[in-house]
Curated annotation (Swiss-Prot):
SUPFAM superfamilies in alphabetical order: Translation proteins SH3-like domain
Entry-linked Pfam families: Ribosomal_L19
Protein name (record): Large ribosomal subunit protein bL19
GO BP field: translation
GO molecular function terms listed in the Swiss-Prot or TrEMBL record: structural constituent of ribosome
Keywords carried by this UniProt record: Ribonucleoprotein, Ribosomal protein
Statement: the UniProt record of this protein carries the keyword Ribosomal protein: yes
Provenance organism: Lachnospira eligens (strain ATCC 27750 / DSM 3376 / VPI C15-48 / C15-B4) (Eubacterium eligens)
One GO cellular component term noted in the UniProt record for this chain: cytosolic large ribosomal subunit
Length: 115
């Protein structure tokens, strides 16, 4: 039974999964369907967490919009996610950056990783 599930999940994985880490600033292009129209909506922010493996892998991105924190979580291998491009590499020392939710202004920034 386990191999059957694994075969089905492997068929649903994206061939080119985007490469990014927690702390990176990313620009996510997602398909939004409104009625009979379909458009691409861009969401740019800091990756707070990545969790799960395989088809169940998800990532959460946070940005501040008009002084209000907005977080969105997407499945990594979803067909809704058109592309994920890394705008800036961040240096994170934690796997989950949940502490950024309480911070505002410059304190909510992640240091840039120089490679």
């Amino acid at each position: 039974m386990n191999t059957i599930i694994k075969n089905i999940e492997d068929a649903q994985l994206k061939a080119q999964a985007p490469e990014f880490r927690v702390g990176d600033t990313v620009r996510v292009s997602a398909k939004i369907k409104e009625g009979n129209r379909e458009r691409i909506q861009v969401f740019e922010g800091t990756v707070l967490k990545k969790q799960g493996t395989g088809v169940r892998a998800t990532f959460t991105v946070r940005k501040i919009s008009n002084g209000v924190g907005v977080e969105k979580t997407w499945p990594l291998h979803s067909p809704i996610v058109e592309k994920v491009e890394v705008v800036r590499r961040g240096k994170a020392r934690r796997a989950k950056l949940n502490y950024l939710r309480q911070r505002t202004g410059k304190a909510a920034k992640v240091k840039e990783l120089v490679r």
